[in-house]
Amino acid sequence: MADNTLRIKPVANTDRPAIGRFIASRWGATVIVHGTVFRPAELLGLVAVRDGRLAGLLTYDVSGDSLEIVTLDAVTPTGGVGSALVTAVADEARRRQVRRLNVTTTNDNLDALRFYQRREFRLFAVRPGAVDESRRLKPQIDEIGLYDIPIRDEIELVRDLAIG
């Protein structure tokens, strides 16, 4: 009988090869956010496992009083994996005494905007032309994105965390 329980665990060094392949298949080797080049396979992260298989992955970077979600991927959307990973990273942020979570998405990613706003994130900043600038570092970033919307801008969302 299969164990359908979703387990969330920190990324371990033994997970890195599989995570590297997973990230590369979805994002390429690098992700560029607000002009910063991240290598998600090398970042801190949380892995969601169901039935012994990778169900999702969240990678993040901690800087000062902020924990930035760099990537969030669920193998099967709308199955609760993304929500579970965001809840787990919020718990990790509180444990680290971090005051806020932030995430950046692109103007075409309406699904991400909906997802994060439904999980207590608020719009914080719009960076017009930021993706156009990122293409100088990563030319393979698509020009046209979801829903046939031209990808041009970054939108940052923030969730304040109650500490204590």
Regions found by a protein language model. Give the residues of each.
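Extreme N-terminal starter segment of soluble prokaryotic enzymes
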Residues: 5-7
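Acetyl-CoA-dependent GNAT
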Residues: 10-79, 83-87, 152, 160-162
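Short, P/G- and charge-enriched loop/turn segments at secondary-structure junctions
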Residues: 33-35, 140-148
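Conserved beta-strand-loop-alpha-helix junction that forms the acyl-donor binding cleft
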Residues: 74, 103-112, 124, 128-135
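Conserved GNAT acetyl-CoA-binding A-motif
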Residues: 93-107
